[in-house]
């Protein structure tokens, strides 16, 4: 399933500052993400995320990202932060992901040592995660976190998906136009591509990224 006509969704992930969240809303970003995965330099505590959530603009989704967290940890985040969407980057199965009664995205690792072209096919993914709201294809390898700043070969994306998909992994203002034109994603997910340092967003990069996404959308309309 491709995105709706000429409207690429934008998610800024790894948020750690309320000011960055406010700016994301002003720029028309569709979703902001908080990371709760152990070992991530962008990880925040549930109480911190709850406080920053107050800075989100109306109609902006709040996404909680996990990687092999326990069920208790996910429940605490759901209770404390009240996210609208969950995102799983680990070995979680469909039963685990859907057990929190919230829509979820399942990340698919596309790194050099990750899912190969044969395994990352639409049928396999959709049979494994029949209840996902969508897939997110990222450049990290299995067991690793996102935000690496590395891209992957976009031609390896599976075809024939019946769910929306987001593209992630090394996307910046310099390549997001080409990424959208090449893959026609439902949305794009960026973290390091709009940062000065892990978790510290750069206002100029954020603005430029959004501008390039909209330029790509206009290109698709022409």
Swiss-Prot record:
This is N-(5'-phosphoribosyl)anthranilate isomerase. Its EC number is 5.3.1.24. NCBIfam families: PRK01222.1-2, PRK01222.1-4. PANTHER family: N-(5'-PHOSPHORIBOSYL)ANTHRANILATE ISOMERASE (PTHR42894:SF1). Keywords: Amino-acid biosynthesis, Aromatic amino acid biosynthesis, Isomerase, Tryptophan biosynthesis. GO terms for biological process: L-tryptophan biosynthetic process. Belongs to the TrpF family. It comes from the Bacteria. The keyword Transport does not apply. It catalyses: N-(5-phospho-beta-D-ribosyl)anthranilate = 1-(2-carboxyphenylamino)-1-deoxy-D-ribulose 5-phosphate. It comes from Xanthomonas campestris pv. campestris (strain ATCC 33913 / DSM 3586 / NCPPB 528 / LMG 568 / P 25). The lineage of its organism: Bacteria, Pseudomonadati, Pseudomonadota, Gammaproteobacteria, Lysobacterales.
């Amino acid at each position: 399933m491709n995105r709706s006509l000429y409207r690429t969704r934008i998610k800024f992930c790894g948020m750690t500052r309320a000011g960055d969240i406010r700016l994301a809303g002003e720029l028309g970003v569709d979703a902001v993400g908080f990371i709760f995965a152990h070992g991530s330099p962008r990880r925040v505590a549930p109480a911190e995320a709850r406080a920053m959530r107050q800075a989100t603009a109306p109609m902006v989704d709040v996404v909680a990202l996990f990687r092999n967290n326990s069920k208790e940890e996910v429940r605490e985040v759901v209770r404390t932060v009240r996210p609208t969407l969950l995102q799983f980057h680990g070995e979680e199965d469909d039963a685990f992901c859907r057990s929190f009664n919230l829509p979820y995205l399942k990340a698919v690792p596309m790194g050099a040592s990750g899912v190969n072209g044969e395994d990352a096919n639409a049928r396999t993914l959709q049979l494994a995660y029949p209840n996902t709201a969508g897939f997110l294809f990222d450049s990290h390898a299995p067991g690793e976190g996102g935000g690496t700043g590395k891209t992957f070969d976009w031609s390896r994306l599976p075809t024939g998906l019946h769910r929306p998909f987001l593209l992630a992994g090394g996307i910046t203002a310099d390549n997001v136009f080409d990424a959208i034109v090449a893959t026609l994603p439902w949305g794009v997910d960026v973290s390091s591509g709009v940062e000065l340092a892990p978790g510290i967003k750069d206002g100029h990069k954020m603005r430029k990224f959004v501008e390039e996404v909209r330029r790509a959308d206009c290109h698709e309309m022409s």
